[in-house]
Amino acid sequence: MFDFDDSRLEDPAVLADASPLLRNLASSGARVRREAATAEAPLTALTDVDRPRAVIAYGPEARLLRAVLEPVCPVPFVAWPALGLPGWVGPLDVVLVIGRRGPESLAVAHEAVRRGARLIAVCPPDSQLALQAASRSTTLLPVGTGDPLAAAVVALVALNQLGLGPSTSPDAIAAAIDGL
């Protein structure tokens, strides 16, 4: 078990250390705000979407989203851990891919588009995922900071827009992170 030494908070030498971990934590709230602002315009495209039969989330934050949404989501929500998609996924479903790179995310997005599912891709706009997943049933939510928590917040806002999740305020989440 790690014991935290409170005296480190009063040691000027320790406080002067510009540790990348502390700097990263200190800017987390700003990254959430930035990603939410960047994705604001594409999120409006999600207001005219019918309620899906199910939501399948793929990516490193899929289990976090499932933990938040499972108690309140009115449709089945699956955090899919495997390559590919379940055999039943089709045009009545939403596939949410949160990814920066990698052949796994590309394969899942390609399969979702091929099957006619509504695809929501949370990724950098110039990524392979964004380029290869483009279709009329794809909504690209651009993220650029590489922060998985910020990407998860954008995904939560998108699912709220679809009426599948709780009201999500990126500013309130960012303020809570800033308070850490």
Language model regions located:
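Glycine-rich phosphate-binding loops that contact phosphosugars or nucleotide phosphates
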Residues: 48-179
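N-terminal start-of-chain detector that recognizes signal peptides
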Residues: 3-5, 26-30, 67-70
